[in-house]
């Protein structure tokens, strides 16, 4: 299964393809009180149960098929799809003389997803995580679909902002999301409108939500103020499928609001805090974010880049200042075994079968990224002692797709911190993750 949200996320603007149906598979008809229902088991559908999430998109490659389980009415107006995936990982810090990171094996994620459609125009998506002995509702929303150009979404959902954050977690190139997600919102609860215009050349999203801090999610609000989000992506050559840039997309996202509450802590790729504010610091008044972003896939290649800026007011005691954080990343990949990138995923031409000499597909990945904390946080004493102002990171790795259900990821990531971090040594992480989805 391929989905952090197991859905069809339109990453180019967050707009889904309306009324998309999974086809193929084995169907059985049964009589019901009100209508005939076809039970479809192991249907060939969109990448792992990623069939209804509305933020997948045109900056994505053609669809990949993979088994899903679904029940659908003969008319296609009603559908229930069941999916899920698990990710088990091993994390090991190399040359960790300061013992900041604990080497461990862990169940990173174990998610069950229900999604579907009712009465033709209404779609829903529920994503629950059972890992780490906790029960967490990651997403819960429903859409009212009027046309491909207009969809109304209500509930807990990903904020339409960072490209990296909008990627489905089971389809990311790397085990860890980029440093840029430290200064971008995660999930928010609110109302969003999204859709495609000009036959898919332009995709848009606009949302009003509670307004989480950088890198955080907002279950509910602690004040009356709200955040407003907007995201637009453009595919200039989308109408010409033969154009070499037909799948290129670029755009910008922005958010703004007046908020008061907790401030963010920025985490390294090893999930260790490298910047924290001094005790007693809170966010206050205005907060503005914006992010230009671009993505391109063609043949064996898939790459993307984004730059994120978060500017907000913070206060501690009698000290108040505006702090400006920025982060950027450039990521790329190449399929070594010749397969074509499909919807940010790889479908092996021949599935893993050692007796037949088949081993699946192999993909090489690389990324360089940087995060800069606002200088004012250090100049005015708002940063905690030992906090780092800069973090530079590069990662290289391999993704092994044994078949459409099983994926292995091996990453080595090195992060270097600036002199403000005192004696903090570079972080060297070797990580391995096994993923299974159905």
What are the roles of these predicted feature ranges?
Residues 57-61, 97-99, 244, 253-254, ...:
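Outer-membrane beta-barrel pore domains
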Residues 67-260, 324-356, 361-379:
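Outer membrane beta-barrel
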Residues 31, 59, 74-78, 424-426:
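Extreme N-terminus of proteins, especially the signal/transit-peptide cleavage junction
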Residues 1-7, 55-56:
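N-terminal acidic, proline/glycine-rich, low-complexity intrinsically disordered segments
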